[in-house]
Amino acid sequence: NAGWYTFLKDINYPYGVKDMPISEDRLKWFLSVKGAIMLGDEDTDPNDGSLRNDKGAKEQGNNRFQRGIRYFERNVLIADSLDMPFRWRLQVVKKAAHENSKMIQAAAPFLLEDL
């Protein structure tokens, strides 16, 4: 679970893409590539020592779970506004906090499905 995201919004990097020369074609490519946001449903500790908690990160949500949901939902809205398919998945891993071992077990089928 990422601690914060670079949103496709007009806010400064690293939390947004303000003043970056991103064409509509490049944006469509980014949103059409197969991808996944995988979140542990228990990754909700706002005081986790490895969680970024500056103003920009906190504006995305109080914890990794909230931030991931908001990032995914925002990208769905952008794809809809561009009238294009969105190929990302949102997968919530039950009973997982910020734990690599539980996340990789859930990620393996997605990562290997095209082999």
Give the ranges of each region predicted by the language model.
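The feature captures the conserved acid-bearing segment of alpha/beta-hydrolase catalytic domains
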Residues: 1-77
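C-terminal catalytic histidine-bearing segment of alpha/beta-hydrolase fold enzymes
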Residues: 49-52, 69-115
